[in-house]
Amino acid sequence: MVGSGAAGGGGGGGGGGDHARSKEAAGMMALHEALRNVCLNSDWTYSVFWTIRPRPRCRGGNGCKVGDDNGSLMLMWEDGFCRPRVAECLEDIDGEDPVRKAFSKMSIQLYNYGEGLMGKVASDKCHKWVFKEPSECEPNIANYWQSSFDALPPEWTDQFASGIQTIAVIQAGHGLLQLGSCKIIPEDLHFVLRMRHMFESLGYQSGFFLSQLFSSSRGTSPSPSSFPLKQQQPPPPQLFNWPGHAPPQLPPGASPLFPPGPAAFHPSSRPMPPFPGGGKDESHLFHLPPAAAAKQPQHMDEHHHHQQQPMAAPQQHGGEAPEGDLKWPNGLSFFTALTGRTEDAKFLFGGGGGGGADDGSKTAAAAQDAGHGGAENVEEYLSLESHSNKARRMESAQSTKFKRSFTLPARMSSSTTSTSPSVSASTAPAPPQQQQGMEYRGPHEGGVYSDLMETFLE
């Protein structure tokens, strides 16, 4: 059993090795085909690809680690292609080709990574163009190369002597591409970019020795499957943190920042925050009028019962104005001074300052004579909301009729006592300051001052 398992394991390892070797062979074939196409489809005579590899052994017996420093890497011949020379006659066929001879010597060369012209081009990831003789337009090109870089490689001298006119070095992929031509080929940036793209994509597809070398020598490079999955982030805090109750529960899959619908955070979908304290003696900010309170559900009547008690207090005290309201000597309050409607102020605050229950009955009688109807509750006039609604209806009814307010002359004050009881309720004995604020009303309101009004207007 153990022997069969070991044999099976060996067979699996052999299968993995065969796959790696076949992949490497396919990569080498693709590289050679690319180098060949560069020479056959252009004016370049030869093409060589130098790969970056670590030195096998250092002095002392210790293996050098990849990437420690530039001295541990080198440029080594990987593959090359040289186009055969076209013989002009049959005698030259058997003759030796000097270009091919110089090309063959390149296969045994080694260059230090980051040193010299070849090493610096590879480390700096750039490209260089070198000509045999400077042209007329570039007379100082040789001096430029000599000053900015190290001296040209000594084997390039043999190449120039064999007939090579242009040498180009381009960093591409995991190595360096060297091209040589027997013609003068000007520098072309588009060609450089095309070569880089071709050899980089070729290297990533075929998986050259260098990529396998780095992944195997480092040993700690993580694979895509070893990366942990993205951890789920905790949900962000709620947008509305109401004190006193838990945040609303969102449906599954819904984000707190993007609710499922517009009603998610609607005011009606959450309870209102409690008032600070919450005692019974503490008044709320808003009070509903008695008419609206009568329409409330039964379970809300008990809650608002203690709120309506302060509202009914002015009725029990004869319609007196609230203590916080300012009064002028003529009896007008701050509210009536702003609105300019003294007859409505009488409905609110009454004609006198301390009439007691009699003033309350006078206010009710004046409300019936003014056309408001006896069926309505007098408390409605104590609410600012109902008062404003009644005032608007009175203005719309009297918009087409004549109405003016004048100060009652002193000599006519005695005649007002013989008027109908409905008007005497509104002209009850009052301080002299308030008698000056009395009004004349139109015929539709009482029918008692029509003759006086016409006489006064004439």
Swiss-Prot record:
Transcription regulation recorded as keyword: yes
Distribution of this protein across tissues and organs: Expressed in root tips. Expressed at high levels in the meristematic zone and at low levels in the elongation zone of the root tip.
Biased composition (Low complexity): 220-232, 308-317, 413-436
Subcellular location: Nucleus; Cytoplasm
Chain positions covered by the region annotation Disordered: 1-21, 220-325, 354-374, 386-458
Biased composition (Pro residues): 245-262
Superkingdom as given in the UniProt entry: Eukaryota
Comp. bias (Gly residues): 1-17
Gene inactivation effect: Defects in root growth.
Record InterPro entries: MYC/MYB_N, RSS3-like
Record keywords, A-Z: Cytoplasm, Nucleus, Stress response, Transcription, Transcription regulation
Pfam families assigned to the protein according to its UniProt record, in alphabetical order: bHLH-MYC_N
Any one GO CC term of the record: nucleus
Protein function: Involved in the repression of jasmonate (JA)-induced genes. Forms a ternary complex with TIFY11A/JAZ9 and BHLH094 to negatively regulate JA-responsive genes. Involved in transcriptional regulation in the root tip. Plays a regulatory role in root cell elongation. Regulates root cell elongation during salt stress.
Quaternary structure (record): Interacts with BHLH094, BHLH089, TIFY11A/JAZ9 and TIFY11C/JAZ11. Forms a ternary complex with TIFY11A/JAZ9 and BHLH094 in the nucleus.
Protein name: Protein RICE SALT SENSITIVE 3
Organism: Oryza sativa subsp. japonica (Rice)
